[in-house]
Amino acid sequence: MKLVYAIVNSDDTYAVNKGLLKAGIRATKLSSTGGFFFVRKTTLLICCPDEQVDLVIEVCKKYSKKRKQFVPSSTIMEPDGAASYPVEVAIGGATIFVTDIERFEKV
């Protein structure tokens, strides 16, 4: 058994979760923040047999879209920086961790 942590942009959560459900895979959803801009994210916890890990990753890849977004440059400059013109940055996609499960009980 494996535990897959899939961290996705909150905008992609519904699509990823729906894709997992279509594949017969259930996930526990946790709200999280992170990244350089402290963007809202969702961490999906997915317990699955070893042979389903690749399927989980493929579903996450399919429904976690990378995209570009403009943010104020003051977000990435020093706090006292005078410039505030928009800067284009890449966001989205998924960060996935796969770990072994030593023991699993559903009580």
Language model feature labels by segment:
Residues 1-107:
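Positively charged, small/polar-rich N-terminal and surface patches that mediate targeting and assembly
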